[in-house]
C-alpha cells in the first residue's frame, strides 16, 4: 500500500511552484475553497505523490512556521544528488546538511524549503551490509551530538 505525504504550508500555490522548480514536481490538480485557500494541491515528484494544503488554523491544520518547526523529514532518492541540491538551492531552499558520502552507502544532504519542510536528498553509491551500517552508526554516535 503506497503512502502519500500531505504537508501543510503557508501558501500552497507558491509551494507548488517552488516544488516544480526545485524538484521537477508536476501539478496534477488542486482543490480551492471559497475563501481562496487551497484544500489540496496534488503533485507528482518522480514516481511518488505529494499533497499540499494551505493552513486552516480553525481546524488545527498548521504549517511549520506556526508550530515552530517540523518533526518530519521527506526523503528523495535521486540519481544525482549534487544536481538536485543545486537546483533546489537555486529555487530558494537552504542547505541544512551539506552533501557527504555516508557510512550507509549514500551521497546525502539535507535541505529546508522556504515553507519550513526538511528534505533529505540521497544518491545510492554502494550496497553496505546491515551489520556494517549498525557498527558504523554506533561509532558515529558514540561521542554524542556534534557541537
Whereabouts are the PLM-identified features?
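Vicinal oxygen chelate
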Residues: 1-6, 17-112, 123-147
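Short acidic-aromatic low-complexity motifs
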Residues: 9-13
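C-terminal catalytic core of tyrosine-transesterase DNA break-rejoin enzymes
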Residues: 115
Amino acid at each position: 500500500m503506497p503512502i502519500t505525504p500531505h504537508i501543510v504550508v503557508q501558501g500552497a500555490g507558491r509551494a507548488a511552484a517552488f516544488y516544480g522548480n526545485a524538484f521537477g514536481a508536476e501539478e496534477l490538480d488542486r482543490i480551492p475553497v471559497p475563501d481562496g485557500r487551497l484544500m489540496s494541491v496534488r503533485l507528482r515528484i518522480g514516481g511518488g505523490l505529494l499533497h499540499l494544503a494551505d493552513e486552516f488554523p480553525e481546524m488545527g491544520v498548521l504549517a511549520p512556521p506556526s508550530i515552530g518547526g517540523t518533526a518530519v523529514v521527506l526523503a528523495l532518492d535521486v540519481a544525482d544528488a549534487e544536481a538536485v541540491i543545486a537546483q533546489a538551492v537555486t529555487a530558494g531552499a537552504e542547505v541544512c546538511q551539506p552533501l557527504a558520502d555516508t557510512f550507509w552507502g549514500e551521497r546525502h544532504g539535507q535541505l529546508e524549503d522556504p515553507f519550513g519542510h526538511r528534505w533529505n536528498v540521497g544518491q545510492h553509491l554502494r550496497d553496505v551490509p546491515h551489520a556494517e551500517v549498525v557498527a558504523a552508526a554506533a561509532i558515529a554516535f558514540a561521542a554524542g551530538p556534534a557541537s
